[in-house]
């Protein structure tokens, strides 16, 4: 298992599921856009082998949604033309092409068979055969703006891990001896999520140790939150500690074969209205297949005669079982028929992402599969005004790469897409998928258009399992540059420009008024809430549409914000603040009660020892020459933070090991009972010191990692030889060569003199090398140090530690990720892109989307219209602003305030610029007079020290006015220069 490559999806699937995936054999039939999306996601995820089958040659319409085909592929077999590029995504996956017939014997050689965009007769042939032989079967297809997916995993399919949620755990406060036994949980975990009937196991209990080896116990939850278990009468008396952990129950799924499920469809839907629409879509697909059987083709694009034929065929269909009272929606059916010949990249991405996730469920037995039909439509992308719908002539093939898209929307939208200029912020997983969408739909391919790709990050190997535009040779190269070049290869007409500087307050001279004046819209593909909020604020300021998406594991969301049409982006209020919220220092230093506390403490140790200490010492040596009694308090307070490294400069690897061993002793023995006071408060156990044991894995790992990091900091060669280190540790322990603390608590003259001598010695050598934490290099000992320090800290305080991967996730703030959900949210944004570029102006047309692929939840809802606020005769929304035109000579603050009162009836009480107070009616008359006479730009410079940069067109102010209500927020004041 290449854990570095698959690290992000291992947090989603787990190691056992990934091992099953790597051993699986999958047959994929159909390599149009939808099939290519399924293939891409499976190869990125790392299936064992993928066999491609498609007997058809590449045509122009395929290029609208198939990113592995090009104009050079025209006339070539689709599977053969796609094979080489798919193989580049993951060299560990065996990819082959089957060019013969699909026979019963062939099917039995695979765990999963997938048909995409296939004929009904092929579906009815392959589906029942797979059911007969226990081969999991999936069928997916798209027709224009509608799509469907069918799953048949057999009559007795066991799901080993039904949910994405980690098993619940809780710390134990007490366990009674009795029948039943009562498990009291610690005070901070009473509000748990255990339910009656849950199975649990126990671990790390002292005293009542019999429970540690018991089989899973069923619990009943009491009113006070305690758990009732079986008979504990004969067990030993409970003393302390312990953790109760949920055991997930496997679930069995029973699926019908396709031939039966077609007549008795069970659809995934969130409400009755969705069920009825899904039944209509089910009938629509059925009649489209019937039309295709009769005419050898799908209905012609926007041909009214063909659409009427489809409606007539539907009237002859037998009602679905259980739907006899549902009437056929002829208008919906007619619209589906008119656009069914088209092929769209966003639809392929959505259905391909969901289908690939179902394949992974079939292989890994992790997460609940669909039961059994999923229908999806985005017909709201079409104009509501029938006079604006495309004509048959406008949708005729033009032998170009956009023919599949023109068949749905006509040439008008294609022309608009070509002239768009979009800013893509973030070239990670979602960013790569969005560049694919841009390339396939033809966005920014003419001289007036383009795509600016902004990302300051560099490619890491762990990116390659999701960010499909990158290859192993691209590791350590800028994401923006590589992604822009790769997108150009997908569509040579795409005008993609990379920017490797961040989009944040420090670069507003780059992403300035002139830059945003050229941009038609923004796509935010960011994993930082703080960055999302900033980008959204820029879009609101410049009145640009914002398409925004994010994922975490199999969760995903996609949202759209259009000026004056929808609400503006706000996001949860706590998002940005919670990203960097630390634990209380007192908790980290003295009374950790959870593994998370220990992880944070270990990370602080890393930063303090190997980065901050070196920076502090280097800075001090460059700026200070002596320590005097007058400045010793401040100076020593600073240097006290780095006392752990203020020793004789190491000269050899052994010196580094001696230091690491001494620091182990200091942290996990000497300081644990500092002052000789043991305690146990609330949920905290009495701490106990550790005795160093070179044969203990974590003791040894700590010294190995710390010594190597210390050596690197001093520019010395380290060592990865574990046998040699064990031998060295044995000698050191026998000779008791561990160092003593260099400094005492008192900082008198002797201490100052000793410290001065140490610093003088260090100044003679080269500066230290700060070690910056890098989470994705398993050979650099960074994560090893934090893992070992966390584990040892947990041992000190009786906290049950967790595995290496979980600690790495916490310390690296790693977001679980998988290719499937990324593809889906990008496809959803692609649909909203159609609407924005089309110029649709009804907020009810747009969609915010939320999905959870693990549990088959798909929710799409219309965004709210922007809320209207009013003050006297003034009305505004979040998209409005008070504009003050430029005049010569420039206005003074006094004339600006007079203008606002005369034009808008606003008597300003406070005026702010970037939180700097420029004016307050509560000031003294003298201070007001000083400010009122200044010109506005002079005032800003006087108060903030900031001088407006050349080219700046607008200054933005916030204001508070007389008579405003408490919850009122006036629109920003845009002062034109």
Curated annotation (Swiss-Prot):
Observed effect of gene inactivation: UBA7-deletion mice display increased susceptibility to viral infection.
Post-translational modification: Ubiquitinated by RNF170.
Top EC class for this record: ligase
Pfam families: E1_4HB (PF16191), E1_FCCH (PF16190), E1_UFD (PF09358), ThiF (PF00899), UBA_E1_SCCH (PF10585)
Pathway: Protein modification; protein ubiquitination
Subcellular location: Cytoplasm; Nucleus
Primary localization class, coarse: cytoplasm
BP GO terms, sorted: innate immune response; ISG15-protein conjugation; modification-dependent protein catabolic process
Entries under SUPFAM superfamilies matching the protein: Activating enzymes of the ubiquitin-like proteins
SMART domains hit by this protein: UBA_e1_C
EC number: 6.2.1.-
Keywords per UniProt: Cytoplasm, Ligase, Nucleus, Ubl conjugation
InterPro entries: E1_4HB (IPR032420), E1_FCCH (IPR032418), E1_FCCH_sf (IPR042302), ThiF/MoeB/HesA (IPR045886), ThiF_NAD_FAD-bd (IPR000594), Ub-activating_enz_E1_C (IPR018965), Ub-E1_IAD_1 (IPR042449), UBA_E1_C_sf (IPR038252)
GO CC term (a single one): nucleus
The keyword Nucleus appears for this protein: yes
Keyword Ubl conjugation (UniProt): yes
NCBIfam families: Ube1 (TIGR01408)
Family: Belongs to the ubiquitin-activating E1 family.
Primary role: E1-activating enzyme that catalyzes the covalent conjugation of the ubiquitin-like protein product of ISG15 to additional interferons stimulated proteins (ISGs) as well as other cellular proteins such as P53 in a process termed protein ISGylation. Plays an essential role in antiviral immunity together with ISG15 by restricting the replication of many viruses including rabies virus, influenza virus, sindbis virus or rotavirus.
Protein name: Ubiquitin-like modifier-activating enzyme 7
Gene: Uba7
């Amino acid at each position: 298992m290449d854990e570095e490559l698959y690290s992000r999806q291992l947090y989603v699937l787990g190691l056992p599921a990934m091992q099953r995936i790597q051993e699986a054999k999958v047959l994929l039939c159909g390599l149009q856009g939808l099939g290519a999306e399924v293939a891409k996601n499976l190869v990125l995820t790392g299936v064992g082998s993928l066999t491609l089958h498609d007997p058809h040659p590449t045509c122009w319409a395929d290029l609208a949604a198939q990113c592995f085909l090009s104009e050079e592929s025209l006339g070539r077999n689709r599977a053969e033309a796609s094979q080489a590029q798919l193989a580049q995504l993951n060299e560990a996956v065996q990819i082959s092409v089957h060019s013969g017939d699909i026979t019963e014997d062939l099917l039995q050689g695979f765990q999963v068979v997938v048909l995409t965009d296939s004929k009904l007769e092929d579906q009815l042939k392959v589906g029942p055969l797979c059911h007969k032989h226990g081969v999991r079967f999936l069928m997916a297809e798209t027709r224009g703006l509608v799509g469907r997916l069918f799953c048949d995993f057999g009559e007795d399919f066991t799901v080993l891990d039904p949910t994405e949620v980690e098993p619940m755990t809780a710390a134990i406060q007490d366990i009674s001896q009795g029948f039943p036994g009562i498990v009291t949980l610690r005070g901070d975990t009473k509000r748990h999520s255990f339910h009656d009937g849950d199975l649990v196991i126990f671990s790390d209990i002292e005293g009542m140790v019999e429970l540690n080896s018991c089989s899973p116990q069923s619990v009943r939850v009491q009113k006070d939150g305690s758990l009732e278990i079986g008979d504990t009468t004969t067990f030993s008396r409970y003393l302390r500690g312990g953790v109760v952990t949920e055991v997930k129950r496997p679930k069995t799924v029973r699926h019908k074969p396709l031939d039966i499920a077609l007549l008795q469809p069970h659809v995934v839907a969130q409400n009755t209205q969705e069920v009825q629409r899904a039944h209509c879509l089910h009938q629509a697909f059925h009649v489209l297949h019937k039309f295709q059987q009769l005419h050898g083709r799908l209905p012609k694009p926007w041909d009214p005669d063909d659409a009427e034929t489809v409606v007539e065929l539907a009237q002859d269909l037998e009602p679905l079982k259980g739907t006899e009272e549902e009437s056929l929606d002829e208008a919906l059916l007619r619209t589906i028929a008119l656009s069914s010949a088209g092929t769209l990249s966003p639809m392929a991405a959505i259905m391909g992402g969901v289908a690939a996730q179902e394949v992974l469920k079939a292989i890994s037995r992790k997460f609940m599969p669909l039961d059994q039909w999923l229908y999806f439509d985005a017909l709201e992308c079409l104009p509501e005004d029938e006079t604006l719908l495309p004509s048959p002539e406008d949708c005729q093939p033009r032998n170009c790469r956009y023919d599949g898209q023109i068949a749905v929307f006509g040439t008008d939208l294609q022309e608009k897409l070509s002239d768009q200029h979009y800013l893509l912020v973030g070239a990670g997983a979602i960013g790569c998928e969005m560049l694919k969408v841009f390339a396939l739909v033809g966005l920014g391919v003419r001289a007036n258009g383009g795509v600016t790709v902004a990302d300051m990050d560099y490619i890491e190997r762990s990116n390659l399992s999701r960010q499909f535009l990158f290859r192993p040779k691209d590791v350590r190269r800028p994401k923006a540059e590589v992604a822009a070049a790769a997108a150009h290869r997908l569509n040579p007409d795409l005008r993609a420009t990379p920017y490797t500087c961040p989009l944040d307050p420090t670069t507003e001279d780059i992403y300035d008024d002139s830059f945003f004046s050229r941009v038609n819209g923004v796509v935010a593909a960011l994993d930082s809430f703080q960055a999302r909020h900033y980008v959204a604020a820029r879009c609101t300021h410049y009145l640009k549409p914002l398409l925004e998406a994010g994922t975490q594991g199999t969760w995903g969301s996609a949202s759209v914000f259009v000026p004056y049409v929808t609400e503006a982006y706000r996001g949860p209020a706590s998002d940005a603040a919670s990203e960097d919220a630390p634990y209380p220092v007192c908790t980290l230093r003295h009374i950790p009660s959870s593994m998370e506390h220990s992880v944070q403490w270990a990370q602080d140790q890393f930063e303090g020892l190997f980065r901050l200490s070196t920076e502090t010492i280097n800075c001090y040596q460059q700026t200070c020459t002596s320590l005097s009694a007058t400045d010793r308090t401040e100076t020593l307070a600073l240097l006290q933070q780095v006392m752990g490294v203020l020793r004789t400069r190491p000269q050899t690897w052994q010196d580094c090991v001696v230091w690491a061993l001494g620091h182990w002793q200091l942290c996990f023995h000497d300081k644990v009972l500092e002052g000789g006071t043991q305690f146990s408060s609330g949920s905290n156990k009495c701490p106990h010191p550790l005795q160093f044991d070179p044969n203990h894995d974590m003791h040894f790992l700590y010294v190995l990692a710390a010594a190597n990091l210390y050596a690197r900091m001093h520019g010395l060669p380290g060592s990865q030889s574990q046998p040699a280190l064990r031998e060295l540790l044995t000698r050191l322990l026998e000779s008791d060569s561990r160092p003593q603390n260099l400094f005492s608590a008192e900082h008198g003259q002797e201490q100052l003199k000793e410290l001065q001598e140490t610093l003088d010695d260090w100044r003679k050598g080269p500066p230290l090398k700060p070690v910056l934490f890098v989470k994705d290099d398993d050979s650099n000992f960074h994560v090893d140090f934090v893992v070992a320090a966390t584990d040892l800290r947990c041992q000190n305080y009786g906290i049950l530690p967790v595995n290496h991967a979980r600690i790495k996730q916490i310390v690296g703030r790693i977001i679980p990720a998988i290719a499937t959900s990324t593809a889906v949210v990008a496809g959803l944004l692609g649909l909203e892109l159609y609407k924005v570029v089309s110029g649709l102006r009804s907020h009810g047309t747009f969609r915010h989307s939320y999905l959870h692929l693990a549990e088959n939840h798909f929710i799409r809802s219309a965004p709210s219209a922007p809320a209207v606020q009013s003050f006297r005769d003034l009305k505004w929304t979040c998209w409005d602003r008070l504009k003050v035109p430029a005049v010569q000579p420039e206005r003074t603050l006094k004339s600006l305030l007079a203008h606002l009162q005369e034009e808008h009836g606003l008597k300003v009480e406070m005026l702010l610029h970037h939180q700097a107070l420029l004016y307050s009616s509560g000031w003294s008359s003298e201070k007001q007079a000083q400010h009122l006479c200044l010109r506005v730009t002079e005032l800003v410079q006087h108060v903030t020290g900031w001088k407006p940069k050349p080219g700046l067109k607008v200054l933005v102010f916030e204001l508070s006015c007389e008579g405003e209500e408490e919850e009122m927020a006036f629109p920003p004041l845009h002062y034109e220069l």
